[in-house]
């Protein structure tokens, strides 16, 4: 069995009487892109600072390559951090910002030049080496910060919400570049974000945080399609949630009632009659049918379209059910498909196939 590069063992962190992290344990593998995902104030950045050595745990241990590093200062941990603010030296050129750590070590000039240009080439900035960093765009400044962080080839690169200040288009481009850089370097990246799309598109695994606890650890597919609890389901993407009760268990299915309609669902949790559950279905898994398209309405819910949002590749619909509950549906847009020409206030039928839903124990 491969030894993890980083082991977080029962970490607690408090500031005064305020708990920030509560019994957090986590292993990080060699060459892994791991994302710490959660809302503001959940403890994810605090954990990053504990790994880097800028903070000390109140209780628990942190191991890097099998060595406990609790007492080691940041410069002894072979871990580098890219901060949200980039923390560049505004009076220095791109080259000198990247070379700074090497100059502190009194590295020979010839070696500095080679290593700096190697790092700048990886982030596609070699042509801007002599430019002052104040003359760069936000995306270019971020690349400089990354080049400076990888110049010594640390075992772990920690990234604290580095994309949050970029505009949407640049943020999307940088997501792809960061992932490709991580693969090229075969370096362990630990990435902090509150953005679910970033986490899903970049990560090998995602660690979902909430109120100082880890709620779930898994691949992007696992945390999206099989969330561990209601918080994960609601935080990762959009979710329509129905509170239901099991009426009948039949083979591998359960029968329940939603909006007065009897529906069949896959019994994925060995649930029993009278169990209260949350039924979760993603907007992209809901199908919306006009009245003229439907002959048999068994297993469908009647509704009325109350909003239509055109997004280019998709059409998002808000459908009001008979109880007044609003659910979201998302359809891929095809301009040649007349079936996607919905009208406001149109009466429709909505459905999803058994097994497309997620069932979770009721949380009250």
From Swiss-Prot:
Q: Report the locations given in the UniProt record.
A: Cell inner membrane
The record's EC number reads 7.6.2.11
Which SUPFAM superfamilies has this protein been placed in? MOP-like (SSF50331), P-loop containing nucleoside triphosphate hydrolases (SSF52540)
Where is ATP annotated to bind?
38-45
Top-level taxon of the source organism: Bacteria
Which residue range or ranges hold the ABC transporter domain?
A: 6-236
User: What does it catalyze?
Assistant: ATP + H2O + polyamine-[polyamine-binding protein]Side 1 = ADP + phosphate + polyamineSide 2 + [polyamine-binding protein]Side 1
Q: Which InterPro entries does this chain map to?
A: AAA+_ATPase, ABC_SmlMolc_Importer, ABC_transporter-like_ATP-bd, ABC_transporter-like_CS, Mo/tungstate-bd_C_term_dom, P-loop_NTPase, PotA-like, Transp-assoc_OB_typ2
Mind listing the UniProt keywords for this protein, alphabetically?
Answer: ATP-binding, Cell inner membrane, Cell membrane, Membrane, Nucleotide-binding, Translocase, Transport
- What membrane topology term does the record carry? Peripheral membrane protein
Pfam families in the cross-refs: ABC_tran, TOBE_2
Q: What SMART domains does UniProt report for this protein, alphabetically?
A: AAA
Q: List, alphabetically, the GO terms of the cellular component aspect.
A: ATP-binding cassette (ABC) transporter complex
Q: How does it assemble?
A: The complex is composed of two ATP-binding proteins (PotA), two transmembrane proteins (PotB and PotC) and a solute-binding protein (PotD).
Q: Which family does it belong to?
A: Belongs to the ABC transporter superfamily. Spermidine/putrescine importer (TC 3.A.1.11.1) family.
Record function comment: Part of the ABC transporter complex PotABCD involved in spermidine/putrescine import. Responsible for energy coupling to the transport system.
Name the PANTHER family on file.
SPERMIDINE/PUTRESCINE IMPORT ATP-BINDING PROTEIN POTA, SPERMIDINE_PUTRESCINE IMPORT ATP-BINDING PROTEIN POTA
Q: What is this protein called?
A: Spermidine/putrescine import ATP-binding protein PotA
Name of the gene: potA
């Amino acid at each position: 069995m491969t030894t993890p590069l980083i082991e977080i063992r029962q970490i607690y962190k408090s500031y005064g009487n305020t708990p920030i992290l509560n019994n957090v344990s986590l292993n990080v593998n060699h060459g892994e892109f791991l994302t710490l995902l959660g809302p503001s104030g959940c403890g994810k950045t605090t954990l990053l600072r504990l790994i880097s050595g800028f903070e000390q745990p109140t209780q628990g241990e942190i191991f890097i390559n099998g060595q406990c590093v609790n007492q080691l200062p940041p410069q002894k941990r072979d871990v580098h951090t890219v901060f949200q603010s980039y923390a560049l030296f505004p009076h220095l050129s791109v080259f000198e910002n990247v070379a700074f750590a090497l100059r502190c070590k009194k590295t020979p000039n010839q070696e500095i030049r080679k290593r700096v240009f190697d790092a700048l080439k990886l982030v596609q900035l070699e042509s801007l080496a002599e430019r002052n960093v104040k003359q760069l765009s936000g995306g270019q400044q971020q690349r400089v910060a990354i080049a400076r962080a990888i110049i010594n080839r640390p075992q772990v690169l920690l990234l604290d919400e580095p994309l949050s200040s970029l505009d949407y288009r640049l943020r999307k481009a940088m997501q792809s570049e960061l992932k490709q850089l991580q693969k090229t370097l075969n370096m362990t990246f630990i990435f902090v974000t509150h953005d679910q799309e970033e986490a899903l598109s970049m990560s090998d695994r995602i660690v979902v945080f909430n109120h100082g606890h880890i709620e779930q650890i898994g691949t992007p597919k696992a945390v999206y399609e099989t969330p561990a609890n209601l918080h994960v389901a609601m935080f990762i993407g959009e979710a329509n949630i129905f509170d239901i009760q099991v009426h009948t268990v039949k083979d591998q299915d359960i029968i329940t009632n939603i909006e007065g309609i009897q529906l069949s669902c896959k019994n994925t949790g060995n649930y029993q009659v009278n169990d209260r559950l949350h039924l979760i279905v993603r907007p992209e898994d809901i199908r919306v049918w006009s009245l003229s398209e439907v002959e048999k309405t068994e297993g469908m819910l009647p509704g009325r379209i109350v909003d239509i949002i055109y997004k280019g590749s998709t059409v998002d619909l808000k459908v009001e059910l008979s109880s007044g509950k609003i659910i979201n549906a998302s359809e891929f847009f095809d301009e040649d498909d007349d079936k996607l020409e919905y009208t406001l206030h149109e009466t429709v039928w909505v459905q999803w196939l058994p097994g497309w839903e997620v069932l979770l124990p009721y949380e009250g």
